């Protein structure tokens, strides 16, 4: 690749825009992958009155927030805009943006938008009830969160928007467009629309034709790390970057997070522990799960895909437990100057493995085709306060998260025949040393913890550097920049104990799903169209 930019004696930096479900961040890195500064703002997605499950993305307000974050990051870093060598954007997957033929963004929804439940059900009936299977085999996605039912909903209920729509992109692509005026999507993020072929890494318009939808709205596809354009004069005035700064194609948050963790080779495995836990295994070539339990997404590394099995609301469940039951521990932790989770882990470390048999019922393993969960509960409690208390319940939650993670990894192994020899644990969950050790003991695998645990923005910055010609290869740079904090080695005796706990939990969870099926309890979450 020709070098578009050559660092001189002066110090240059890369900027990553990270558009998550709950916030937007502008993060500045130096060329060695060190985070220099960040600007961050929370955003909320709007429920439309009388549209159940809707979660619209406020294009005008959120662009203003993104610009504020870029200015804030530059201010916090204390550097002039001309020292930003390139910028790229990543975002939550599944969120889509529509544009009219003049290039004006006219409608967008967030990843969690579930308004199209009826359309999902209708689409499943197409082709003698085989349409969803056809979508999955080609794209690795089911219909529940794909773009197809959302577009059909617009055709049914907002025909004014549907008729105007000229182009579709993802939210990361929208940020790049607002900076540069250039429209394109990348495979890693666009792959979650259910419209992108895993093998060709390009659109499969026949799927829209089958659904009776327009196929003329598909934008150009460019690989992550490709130079898209430059920051326009108009955008520069708003965001504080210098006009002419290279804008580089970004991607999906999980895939770029894996790049930032150096998870770039076939069979490498990561557990990303945030609000959701993603269990991700790199596959050398596209293959899908015959049981349709696991989603398959394009990696940002061309030719490679990722099998991804998701645990639902894992981080959110821990936060609920802390906020609902641990007010005393929050006060004690504040006085001690430590994080509440650190105190709770210290308490939980005195509870024996297995947590006295307590079984949390929250997320199931992923069942992508029929994705729903049991009602949240704790099973097999004791009224002995020495055995059943906050420390026990907290440890049980950490153990259960690891058990669900192991189940998710197992079902990936079942269809891919890839059995990892170690895994990378990142995200907020990996800050917990007890949790990391429990994950090693439950999975039976060495667990490696990186120094940079929130690696999505770093992966995005690497893509920016490749597009600007600073780095020659995304994979090589990801491997070079990742640094390791610690490794947790599994204990064979505890692994055997947790195998028994896992078997019991799976049997109990099936019974709990039966209560939901009979309308006696309420599911933690149910996919649209079920």
From Swiss-Prot:
Catalyzes the phosphorylation of autoinducer-2 (AI-2) to phospho-AI-2, which subsequently inactivates the transcriptional regulator LsrR and leads to the transcription of the lsr operon. Phosphorylates the ring-open form of (S)-4,5-dihydroxypentane-2,3-dione (DPD), which is the precursor to all AI-2 signaling molecules, at the C5 position. Its main location: cytoplasm. GO terms for biological process: carbohydrate metabolic process; quorum sensing. It is found in: Cytoplasm. HAMAP family: LsrK. One of its GO terms (cellular component) is cytoplasm. Its EC number is 2.7.1.189. This is Autoinducer-2 kinase. The gene is lsrK. One of its GO terms (molecular function) is autoinducer-2 kinase activity. Keywords: Cytoplasm, Kinase, Transferase. It comes from Escherichia coli (strain ATCC 8739 / DSM 1576 / NBRC 3972 / NCIMB 8545 / WDCM 00012 / Crooks). Signal peptide: none annotated. InterPro entries: AI-2_kinase, ATPase_NBD, Carb_kinase_FGGY, FGGY_C, FGGY_Carb_Kinase, FGGY_N. Belongs to the FGGY kinase family. Pfam families: FGGY_C (PF02782), FGGY_N (PF00370). The keyword Kinase applies. CDD domains: ASKHA_NBD_FGGY_AI-2K. It comes from the Bacteria. It is an enzyme of class 2 (transferase). It catalyses: (S)-4,5-dihydroxypentane-2,3-dione + ATP = (2S)-2-hydroxy-3,4-dioxopentyl phosphate + ADP + H(+).
């Amino acid at each position: 690749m020709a070098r578009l930019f050559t660092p001189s004696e002066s110090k240059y930096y890369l900027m990553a825009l990270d558009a998550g479900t709950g916030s937007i961040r502008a993060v500045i890195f130096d060329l060695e992958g060190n985070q220099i500064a960040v600007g961050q703002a929370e955003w909320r997605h709007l429920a439309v009155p009388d549209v159940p499950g809707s979660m619209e993305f406020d294009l005008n307000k959120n662009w203003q927030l993104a610009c504020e974050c870029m200015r804030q990051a530059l201010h916090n870093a204390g550097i002039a805009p001309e020292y930003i060598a390139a910028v790229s954007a990543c975002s939550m997957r599944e969120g889509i943006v529509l544009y009219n033929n003049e290039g004006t963004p006219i409608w967008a929804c967030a990843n969690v938008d579930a308004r199209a439940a009826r359309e999902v059900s209708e689409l499943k009936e197409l082709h003698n009830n085989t349409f969803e299977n056809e979508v999955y085999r080609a794209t690795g996605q089911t219909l529940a969160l794909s773009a197809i039912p959302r577009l059909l909903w617009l055709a049914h209920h907002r025909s004014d928007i549907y008729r105007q729509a000229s182009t579709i992109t993802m939210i990361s692509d929208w940020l790049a467009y607002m900076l540069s005026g250039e429209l394109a999507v990348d495979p890693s993020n666009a792959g979650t629309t259910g419209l992108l072929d895993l093998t060709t890494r390009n659109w499969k318009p026949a799927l829209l034709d089958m659904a009776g939808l327009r196929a003329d709205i598909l934008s150009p596809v460019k690989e992550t790390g490709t130079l898209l354009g430059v920051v326009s004069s108009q955008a520069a005035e708003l965001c504080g970057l210098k006009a002419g700064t290279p804008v580089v194609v970004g991607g999906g948050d999980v895939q770029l997070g894996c790049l930032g963790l150096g998870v770039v080779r076939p069979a490498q495995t990561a557990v990303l522990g945030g609000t959701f836990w993603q269990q991700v295994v790199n596959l050398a070539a596209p293959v899908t799960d015959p049981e349709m339990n696991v989603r398959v997404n394009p990696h940002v590394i061309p030719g490679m895909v990722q099998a991804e099995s998701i645990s639902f609301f894992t981080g959110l469940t821990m936060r609920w437990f802390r906020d609902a039951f641990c007010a005393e521990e929050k006060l004690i932790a504040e006085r001690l100057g430590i994080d509440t989770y650190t105190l709770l882990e210290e308490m939980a470390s005195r509870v024996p493995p297995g947590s006295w048999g307590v079984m949390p019922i929250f997320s199931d393993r992923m069942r992508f085709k029929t994705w729903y969960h049991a009602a949240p509960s704790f099973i097999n409690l004791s009224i002995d306060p020495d055995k059943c208390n906050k420390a026990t319940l907290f440890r049980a939650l950490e153990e259960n998260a690891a058990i669900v993670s192991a189940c998710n990894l197992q079902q990936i192994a079942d269809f891919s025949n890839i059995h990892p020899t170690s895994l990378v644990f990142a995200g907020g969950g990996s800050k917990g040393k007890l949790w990391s050790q429990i994950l090693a003991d439950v999975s039976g695998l060495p667990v490696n913890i990186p120094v940079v645990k929130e690696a999505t923005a770093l992966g995005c910055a690497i893509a920016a550097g490749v597009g600007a010609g600073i780095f020659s290869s995304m994979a090589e740079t990801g491997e070079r920049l990742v640094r390791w904090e610690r490794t947790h080695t599994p204990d064979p005796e505890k692994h055997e104990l947790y195998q028994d706990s896992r078997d019991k939990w799976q049997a109990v969870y099936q019974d709990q799903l039966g209560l939901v099926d009979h309308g006696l309890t309420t599911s933690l979450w149910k996919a649209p169209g079920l």
